[in-house]
């Protein structure tokens, strides 16, 4: 009788250990096999998010269980998320719950009209081009930034920036105003004045140069060519 009890206890321990390992692997084992981006649009339904994750992660049953536990279906954040190999379902669910976005890189160069800039931005952030154009051409927005609708474009300094994918057009413009103020140091402004160019002309020239080359040692030569053309009319 005692022998049977011991055997039964051993079997129970093995079963419990097996269940524990199974659950641990399900919740904390690797559920992401390859790096990929996940875009969650504002106002998305939870079912849409689940469908996207079904194609991106393993252990989906465990994800659904944990997501239900933290009420992810009631509260998840839109944004751009990067699923990295080695992540588990707990990490993925918490990332979406807390809105731990990965910024996107936004390159501004060779744009001379609101429509061109809006088209470029709309491929890199959530807002559509029509909404972006509306903000870029809004006189009130330009005045708030300290410009008018004509000179607002001199604020956009050609470079590559990091934004959250969910950045609104208004937030984008505010950020670019800060970058503009940071760029125009007294030393740079004095150098610009000596060149005889306006800030708008400098920004236009910078956009052209940035489009032609990314090599910093070539930029002065190319800029000099265009400055000579401007002076010759």
Located regions from the model:
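Conserved catalytic or metal-liganding residues and their short signature motifs at active sites
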Residues: 1-233
């Amino acid at each position: 009788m005692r022998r049977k009890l011991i055997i039964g206890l051993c079997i129970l321990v093995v079963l419990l250990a097996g269940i524990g390992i199974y659950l641990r692997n399900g919740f904390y084992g690797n559920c992401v096999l390859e790096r990929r981006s996940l875009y969650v649009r504002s106002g998305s339904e939870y079912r849409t998010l689940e469908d996207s994750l079904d194609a991106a992660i393993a252990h989906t049953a465990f994800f659904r269980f944990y997501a239900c536990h933290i009420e992810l279906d009631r509260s998840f954040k839109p944004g751009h998320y990067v699923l990295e190999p080695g992540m588990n379902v707990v990490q993925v669910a918490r990332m979406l719950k807390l809105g731990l976005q990965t910024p996107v890189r936004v390159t501004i160069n060779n744009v001379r009209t609101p429509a061109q800039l809006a088209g470029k931005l709309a491929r890199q952030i959530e807002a559509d081009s029509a909404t972006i154009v509306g903000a870029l051409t809004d006189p009130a927005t330009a005045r708030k930034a300290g410009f008018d609708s004509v000179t607002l474009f001199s604020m956009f300094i050609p470079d590559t920036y990091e934004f959250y994918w969910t950045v609104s057009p208004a937030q984008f413009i505010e950020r670019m105003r800060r970058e503009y103020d940071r760029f125009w140091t007294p030393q740079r402004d004095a150098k610009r004045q000596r060149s005889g160019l306006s800030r708008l002309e400098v920004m236009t020239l910078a956009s052209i140069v940035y489009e032609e080359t990314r090599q910093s040692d070539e930029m002065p030569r190319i800029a000099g060519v265009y400055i000579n053309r401007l002076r010759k009319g």
